[in-house]
Amino acid sequence: EIPGELKKKEKIIAEAYLKVNKHLSTVVKKSDIHTGQFRTRKVTILAGKKTKETIHHENGIELKLHLERTYFSARSGSERLRIAKLVKPGEEVLVMFSGAAPYPLVIAKNSEARHVYGIELNPEAHTYAMENVLLNNLQDRVTIVHGDVKHKIPPLKKKFDRVVMPLPKTGEQFLDLALLKAKKGASIHLYSFLDETEIDPYAKKVKEICKKLGSPVKVLDKVKCGQFSPGTFR
């Protein structure tokens, strides 16, 4: 991210950044806007190799992905590890909207979960997810499914101790599916982008939705795990 006043010098800055950071091979500039069904965004190569595919290192895993074809936020790395540290030995974990599998892999790598399941609609992200499971040698503990959660979750025969819903917007619209496959006493991690003043009302809204669905819940915690814009948090 380069300030607007330095835009004319962005390529010079990118070249200098490459020289200082020998482990990097490409520097790109990302668009501010996510677009389309899969919330992807364009990037522009400023320096280095002409590739938009990368391997991201985080919390003991390697994550291969294409910067324009898969949604991914490196800034959520600490949140992924936070969730992994909450997982108890033997838990069965479901990750909805699992992308290239950052959450499933970080959870499996940093916890004693029995098994982690991920479901992703984006076919390109799913392809990378399958490759990433093998890349990290976690095929015995991570299963990735391609498809729409609306169609893939109801037929599942098992229920889960923990459901993670890393969809940054409209996640509450899928609470019925999360509750359907949550064991009694399970934990559900729901995300949204909210202003400071919207956090408590949103928590109340979530409780009301779950009550109407016949599954009353308790809000155990409200965590700010990133800043989307000034005054707006994830």
Regions found by a protein language model. Give the residues of each.
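SAM-dependent transferase fold signal centered on methyltransferase-like domains
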Residues: 1-234
